[in-house]
Amino acid sequence: MVIPADLPALVAPVAWMLGTWEGWGMRAVAPTPGQDRPAEDAPADTPVVEEIRGDVVGEQMRLVTRVYAGEASAPIDPTWDAAQGLAAIQKGDLISEETLYVSVAPSDVPLPPPGQYNSREFTATSASTEGHSAVWDGVSVGPRVQMVSDAIALGADATRLTHLGRMFGLVAGELMWTQERTLDGEDDADVEISGRLHRTEQASTDSGEVIDGIDDSRDGFLV
C-alpha cells in the first residue's frame, strides 16, 4: 500500500476514516422540551439514513456527519449491511449535522510489527445543528476509535446532556459506529444513535493522490 507523501503524519492513524461513507442506522426518540425521557407510549427507535465525510484539514481530520429521517419499506432487519439498509430505507428530511475536528497527539513510539497497532491519543471539538458543542478526548487503536466528552455546551433549545460517548470501528470494510448520551439528571447512559456505512468515495491529499486508508482484503490501514 502506498502512503501519499503529503499525507500529514498526524492524520495517518485515523486515515482509514477518510472519504465519503453512506449507510443507515437507528436513532432513539428524543425527549420533548421539558421532558427528560420519551413517554412510555412514544414511538420506538426510528430508522435513519447517515452520511459521513472525512477530509484532511491541515494537520487535522474533519468529519461531517449528516443524519436524515428514514422511512423503511420493509420491517427493519438488524443484520442488513449498509447497501441493504439504503435500498430499504427512503431518505427524508435532515435531522442533524455535526462538524468534528480531530487532532491526534504526536508520538515517538516505534511502529509495531505488521498486524499490531499502537494506541494514539487525540482531542476533538465538535458543533452540531442540535445545539451541542463538545470537547472530546479519545484514543485510536488500529481501525477502532473510542471518544468521550463531559465538556458539553448547550444551546437554549438543546437536549440537556451531561455526557457523550462515541465508538467507531471497521468491520468487514464497513464503518460501524454508536453514540451514547447521559441526559441531565440521569445516572446511566443510553444509546442515542447507531450506524452502519460503506465507503462510496475515497479522499485525496492536496496533491490529488488518493488516500487508500484501508486494505479491505486484510482489514489493514496506514499506521
Predicted segments — roles?
Residues 2-223:
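Soluble ligand-binding/transfer domains with enclosed cavities or grooves
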